[in-house]
Curated annotation (Swiss-Prot):
The modification N6-(pyridoxal phosphate)lysine is found at residue 265. One of its GO terms (cellular component) is cytoplasm. This is Glutamate-1-semialdehyde 2,1-aminomutase. Its EC number is 5.4.3.8. Its main location: cytoplasm. One of its GO terms (molecular function) is pyridoxal phosphate binding. The lineage of its organism: Bacteria, Bacillati, Bacillota, Clostridia, Eubacteriales. The gene is hemL.
């Protein structure tokens, strides 16, 4: 009996497409998805009993591996005392204090329930603070399913081949300007034309939602310069790369200070969580201190805060975790490039720490959305199916990142490279 198929087919009766997030349907690779039952460390198991070495890690959050003992212990302890109050708790103070005291450029922070909430709230705050309306986002960058961001977005929008999104009125996107990632001149032209109306720039400082694309430090400095010149705010969307490329996130890669930063994924320890923070003078514009209103019944939920606190504290106290991830990440990157060269496969590997994408292309580098769109989707599909059959859970999309955890070992990397070597292209 194929339990995966049975469960997925029944799910289609009750959930649109059988899923609660489109990329999980595996529509772009043409097969039914495995239905996951359990996970431990770097391994997951589906309903048919098949085991996989997991390079998706819940799309990034599980940097400590699945069911980390300390995170599970924290969740159990808190759940015996509280589930939800809709009131202040010491746990939310403990996490907020840890984040503000150990991260750069975060004087104050506000907890929310998802990355989407964090980014949409940060943009609202930027508009309220500057008294301006327009926001620059970059083609291929995904900042959640907020109406104003669903234009030339990455992630599932790109995976599913959706040109935009039905249900988003023109009115909702009229103040969204599209920049080209790593193109200084084009962004400068946007400011020359709209500068007095631009509230801010929101950017993934390491893009992960069009696949991993690194930001040129020179480009990032130009963004800071333009924001300072025109009185706009620079917002780092570190929902994916925060606590992943380094404990302090992508800010460590640039000699640039953002005005606001958004977090999610890792900071929730695998539970629904998000946050946005920044300079005190900006954050104090939030209600109840200021006129920018944002609220949430489940924001700062005690169980989520306990999972986040256990995760963030463990990462902060163990910098060697990042050394390990860099070591195995470097081995994986070098290994696949050597194999591809030997086989004559056109391949670009973009990696930053524990996030990485294999782009099947004859380009020498992949540095923006237009480059990503030229990559060979059919070859990626063959590669994905090959690796899945070999026991590897990787993203079912050319336009997503693979992730590494502290539980991945050199043996896991060796097995991946062995499987990749048998891929015929």
């Amino acid at each position: 009996m194929d339990r995966n198929k049975e469960i997925f087919e029944e799910s289609k009766k009750y959930m649109p497409g059988g899923v609660n997030s489109p990329v999980r349907s595996f529509g772009s690779v043409g097969i039914n998805p495995p239905v996951i039952k359990s996970g431990k460390g770097a391994m997951i198991k589906d309903e048919n009993g098949n085991e996989y070495i997991d390079f998706v890690l819940a799309w990034g959050p599980m940097i400590l591996g699945h069911c980390d003992e300390d995170v599970v212990k924290a969740i159990k302890k808190t759940s015996e005392e509280s589930i939800a109050f809709g009131a202040s708790t010491k746990l939310e103070l403990d996490l907020a204090k840890l984040l503000c005291e150990t991260l750069d450029n975060v004087d104050m922070i506000r907890m929310v329930n998802s990355g989407t909430e964090a980014t949409m709230s940060a943009v609202k705050l930027a508009r309220g603070y500057t008294k301006k309306d327009k926001i620059i986002k970059f083609a291929g960058c995904y900042h959640g399913h907020f109406d104003g961001f669903l234009i030339e977005a990455g992630s599932g929008v790109l995976t599913e081949g959706i040109p935009g999104c039905l249900g988003v009125p023109e009115e909702s996107i009229k103040n969204t300007l599209i920049g080209i990632y790593n193109d200084e001149k084009q962004v400068e032209e946007l400011f020359e034309k709209y500068g007095n109306d631009i509230a801010g720039i929101i950017i993934e400082p390491v893009a992960g939602n069009m696949g991993v694309v690194k930001c040129d430090p020179k480009f990032m400095r130009k963004l800071r310069e333009l924001c300072d010149k025109y009185g706009a705010l620079l917002i780092f969307d570190e929902v994916m790369c925060g606590f992943r490329v380094a404990y302090k996130g992508a800010q460590t890669l640039f000699d640039v200070k953002p005005d606001l930063v958004t977090y999610a994924k890792i900071m929730g320890g695998g539970l629904p969580c998000g946050a946005y923070g920044g300079r005190r003078e900006i954050m104090e514009n939030l209600s109840p201190l200021g006129g920018v209103y944002q609220a949430g019944t489940m924001s700062g939920n005690p169980i989520v805060m306990s999972a986040g606190l256990a995760t963030v504290k463990k990462l902060y106290e163990n910098p060697s975790y990042y050394d390990h991830i860099e070591k195995i990440g470097s081995k994986l990157e070098k290994g696949v490039l050597e194999i591809a060269k030997k086989k004559g496969l056109g391949l670009v590997v973009n990696r930053q720490g524990g996030m990485m994408t294999l782009f099947f292309t004859d380009l020498k580098e992949v540095k923006c959305y237009d480059d990503v769109k030229t990559c060979d989707g059919e070859r990626f599909k063959r590669y994905f199916l090959h690796m899945l059959n070999k026991g590897f859970n990787i993203p079912p999309s050319q336009f997503e990142a693979m992730f590494l955890s502290v539980k991945h070992t050199e043996e896991h990397i060796d097995k991946f490279l062995e499987a990749f070597e048998s891929f015929e292209g």
